[in-house]
Design a protein with these regions (language model features):
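TM-lumen/periplasm interface segments of multi-pass membrane proteins
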Residues: 60-105
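Beta-strand acidic-aromatic groove motif in beta-rich domains, primarily in extracellular
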Residues: 62-73, 158-159, 245, 453-458
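Bacterial Sec-dependent N-terminal signal peptides
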Residues: 1-29
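C-terminal functional modules
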Residues: 387, 391-531
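Structured, solvent-exposed acidic/aromatic patches
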Residues: 88-396, 431-436
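Membrane-proximal, proline-rich intrinsically disordered regions
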Residues: 20-79, 125, 466, 478-531
C-alpha cells in the first residue's frame, strides 16, 4: 500500500512538472520540486517517466486539461482521416476543414506542441537518468524515443531532434534524412544495452510493472527494436536503398527476431488504467465513422474483418449495410450520422505495431531482393496473422479470392459517387510485375494495421497504395495541395512564425520546400524504385 501511495504521489507531481515545461526551449524548467532521490524510490521515477512516454505515443493521459481531445487533434482529424481509414460524422468547423484541405492550424500543430511539451522532455530526462546505471531502461527509453518521434517527423519533415536540449546550437532542427539516420543509431544503442543486460541477468523483469506495451520481458523489447528498424528501413527504401539494406542486415545478425505470432506486437494496454481515446471519440462523442475507402475495399473484397472493424449502419433505410463517408464532401448536415461507426471502445487496446505489419514489411524486403525469404509466403503469413489476431480462421478462401474493390455510392448525395480506385485482389499471382505485387502487399498491410492511422498514412504516401479516393472538394490555400497527389504533410505550427521566426526559418530551410501540405517529405519520392 505504501509503495502504491508513493507511486501515485510521484506520478501526480511528475505530471504537473511536465505540464509546466511547455516550450522545448524551456524543457529543463522543472517546477515540481521532485528531487532525484524522490525518483529513485523503488525505481518509481524511471517507471513513471517511461509510463508517461508509453501513454504519450497513442496520446491519452491527463496533464491537467482533460483526456481524449488531444488525440482527436493530434491524430484522428489528421492521419486517421488522410490514411483513408475514418471520417468525422459531424459538420465540424461548418463542414470545411482538413477533410477538404482547408487545413486548420490548431489541429495541425497539436502533434508538435504535445510531443515537445509533454513527451520529449520525459524522454530526455529518462535518457539522462538511466544512461549509466540502468542499461535495460536506457534501451527501452531509446526504443520509445524512436517510436514516438518517427511519428512526428513523418507528419512534418524536419524536427528538433539531436539538438533538442542544446541551447548552444540554438535548438537547431535536423533534416528528415539526418533524423532517420539518428533513429538507426538510437536503435543500435538500444539493442546493445538490452542484449548486454539480458546476457548478464537473463531472468530479470524489473520493468514488467511499468510495461503497458509488451509483456515486461526484455527480449520482447529487442524484438520491438528489430521490428521498428525494419519499418523505418522500408520507409527509406526508395530514397536511400543502400542504407535500408544495411539496416536490414543488422536485423539478420541479431538473434532475437521480429514480432511474428498473432499475439505479438506493441499495443498500449487498457488494463493499466489507460483508456483508448479513439474509443471515446467513437462511442461517446459519436465523431468517428467508416471512410469511403474502407467501404470500397472491405465490402468489395467481402473481407471478414469488416464486421470486426466496423458496426452496421443504424439508419433504418440502410439496415444490414456497412457504409462510409468520402473525404472532402464538405457537409453541414447530420445525414451521415446513421452510417457505420468503428468497433473501438475505451477498453480496446491501442495498437502501435502488429506482427502482421512485420510480415508485410518482410514481404516487401523479399520483393526487393534484400532477403532470401519468399515474398508470397511472407504476404500470406501477413494476411493469416491479421486474421488470427482477430479470431478469424479459414483464411484459405480469402487468399484465393479475385474479388475487387467496389464503387462508392454515397448514401445522401450522388455527386459524391466515384468508381473504385483499388484494382488488385487478395490472391497472389507470381506472374504479376513487381509494382502490382507491391500494391497487393501494401493494400493488405493497410487493412491489417487498422485503426493505426499514423503508420497507414505514412505508408500510403510512401508507396501510393492503397489507391485512395481523391477529396470531393479541394479548398487548400492557393491550390497548394494537389487533388490527385493528395496531402503530403502537415505545416509547422503557425505560431512559430511570430513567436520564434528564427526557428521557423531554419525548419523551412531544412524542409527544402514551401511550408504547406503539398510539399513532399524526404522519403516521399513519388516513385517506388523497384528494380
Amino acid at each position: 500500500m505504501k509503495r502504491k501511495f508513493v507511486y501515485l504521489y510521484l506520478l501526480g507531481l511528475l505530471l504537473f512538472s511536465v505540464a509546466c515545461t511547455g516550450n522545448f526551449r524551456d524543457y529543463n524548467t522543472d517546477l515540481s520540486g521532485i528531487t532525484d532521490d524522490d525518483l529513485i524510490i523503488d525505481d518509481n521515477g524511471y517507471g513513471i517517466r517511461l509510463g508517461i512516454i508509453q501513454q504519450g505515443i497513442y496520446f491519452n493521459y491527463d496533464y491537467g486539461k482533460g483526456k481524449n481531445w488531444p488525440f482527436q487533434l493530434i491524430q484522428n482529424l489528421n492521419a486517421d482521416m488522410f490514411s483513408g481509414y475514418m471520417h468525422d460524422g459531424k459538420p465540424l468547423n461548418g463542414g470545411s476543414h482538413n477533410s477538404d484541405y482547408n487545413m486548420q492550424d490548431g489541429w495541425n500543430s497539436a502533434m508538435w506542441t504535445h510531443m515537445y511539451s509533454y513527451i520529449f522532455p520525459q524522454i530526455y530526462q529518462s535518457e539522462n537518468a538511466t544512461r549509466n546505471t540502468h542499461p535495460a531502461l536506457f534501451g527501452i527509453t531509446k526504443i520509445l524515443k524512436v517510436e514516438a518521434m518517427h511519428r512526428v517527423t513523418d507528419y512534418y519533415g524536419p524536427i528538433i531532434y539531436k539538438n533538442f536540449a542544446n541551447a548552444e546550437k540554438h535548438y537547431r532542427p535536423d533534416k528528415q534524412e539526418d533524423v532517420y539516420y539518428e533513429f538507426f543509431n538510437e536503435l543500435d544503442s538500444a539493442v546493445v544495452a538490452l542484449t548486454g543486460y539480458i546476457e548478464e541477468k537473463p531472468e530479470s523483469n524489473g520493468f514488467a510493472r511499468f510495461d503497458i506495451l509488451l509483456d515486461g520481458k526484455y527480449p520482447s523489447w529487442v524484438k520491438f527494436a528489430n521490428s521498428l528498424r525494419l519499418r523505418l528501413a522500408m520507409r527509406i527504401a526508395s530514397v536511400a536503398p543502400d542504407k535500408a539494406r544495411a539496416e536490414i542486415q543488422k536485423i539478420k545478425e541479431n538473434d532475437y527476431g521480429f514480432f511474428e505470432a498473432e499475439t505479438g506486437g506493441a499495443v498500449v494496454s487498457t488494463k493499466s488504467g489507460y483508456t483508448n481515446p479513439l474509443g471515446e471519440l467513437n462511442r461517446v462523442w459519436n465523431e468517428t465513422y467508416m471512410s469511403a475507402n474502407m467501404e470500397s475495399i472491405l465490402v468489395g473484397y467481402n473481407d471478414p474483418r469488416l464486421g470486426i472493424y466496423f458496426e452496421l449502419c443504424t439508419d433504418e433505410t440502410l439496415k444490414g449495410q456497412y457504409r462510409g463517408i468520402r473525404q472532402g464532401t464538405c457537409f453541414a448536415h447530420s445525414h451521415y450520422s446513421g452510417l457505420s461507426k468503428l468497433f473501438v471502445k475505451q477498453s480496446t487496446d491501442a495498437p502501435l505495431m502488429t506482427a502482421s505489419e512485420v510480415w508485410f514489411l518482410r514481404a516487401e524486403a523479399a520483393l526487393r531482393g534484400w532477403t532470401d525469404e519468399d515474398e508470397e509466403t511472407c504476404y500470406q503469413n501477413g494476411v493469416t496473422t491479421s486474421f488470427h489476431q482477430w479470431g478469424i480462421y479459414g483464411v484459405e478462401d480469402y487468399l484465393q479470392s479475385e474479388r475487387k474493390a467496389s464503387d462508392f455510392i454515397d448514401t445522401y448525395d450522388e455527386e459524391n459517387n466515384i468508381e473504385a480506385r483499388c484494382k488488385v485482389s487478395p490472391k497472389w499471382n507470381p506472374l504479376d510485375d513487381k509494382e502490382t505485387k507491391l500494391e497487393k502487399i501494401i493494400t493488405q498491410k493497410w487493412i491489417a494495421m487498422f485503426p493505426e492511422g499514423c503508420e497507414a498514412w505514412a505508408e500510403q504516401r510512401r508507396t501510393g497504395y492503397p489507391r485512395l479516393f481523391p477529396v470531393r472538394f479541394n479548398h487548400s490555400r492557393n491550390g497548394s495541395i494537389d487533388t490527385e497527389i493528395m496531402v503530403r504533410r502537415l505545416n509547422f505550427p503557425g505560431t512559430l512564425q511570430t513567436e520564434d521566426p528564427e526557428q521557423y526559418s531554419a525548419l523551412v530551410e531544412a524542409l527544402g520546400g514551401n511550408d504547406h501540405g503539398g510539399t513532399r517529405l524526404w522519403w516521399d519520392t513519388g516513385n517506388n524504385n523497384l528494380e
